[in-house]
């Protein structure tokens, strides 16, 4: 595990994402590179989602939650039936990274507000990118 990490942020079409999500991250085997991918959307929303992913990944690492645990839970959640439109796997009570996801969302909201964008507009941008 590296004490230093590099970030790489990319905006991709939803079809190029690992699964159906507006934001994702992967950590390399040495944990020296955090690759964050977001769906293509207006700049402030792209940066807000990227920030969310960076914060969530960092908090998970500090808590000892692996990227594989997050990915596996997200995959399981996405395969389940009956989730409402707009729900996210990280907000599910069963998510091993729920606390980290919710903290990342708080910071995402603060960023969106500081950038002068309404939260509902940001949510529409995210939904429109998928």
Where are these regions (language model features)?
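Metalloprotease/metallohydrolase-associated module, dominated by Zn2+-dependent proteases
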Residues: 1-47, 61-130
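Active-site recognition of the HExxH zinc-binding catalytic motif
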Residues: 48-60
């Amino acid at each position: 595990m590296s004490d230093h990490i590099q970030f790489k942020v990319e905006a991709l079409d939803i079809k190029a994402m690992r699964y159906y999500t507006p934001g994702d991250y992967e950590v390399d085997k040495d944990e020296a590179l955090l690759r964050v991918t977001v769906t293509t959307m207006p700049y402030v929303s792209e940066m807000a989602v990227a920030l969310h992913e960076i914060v969530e990944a960092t908090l998970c690492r500090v808590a000892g939650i692996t990227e594989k645990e997050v990915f596996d839970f997200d995959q399981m959640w996405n395969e389940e039936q009956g989730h409402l439109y707009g729900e996210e796997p990280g907000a599910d009570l069963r998510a091993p990274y729920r606390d980290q996801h919710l903290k990342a969302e708080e910071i995402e909201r603060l960023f969106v507000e500081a950038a002068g964008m309404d939260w509902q507009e940001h949510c529409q941008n995210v939904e429109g990118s998928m």
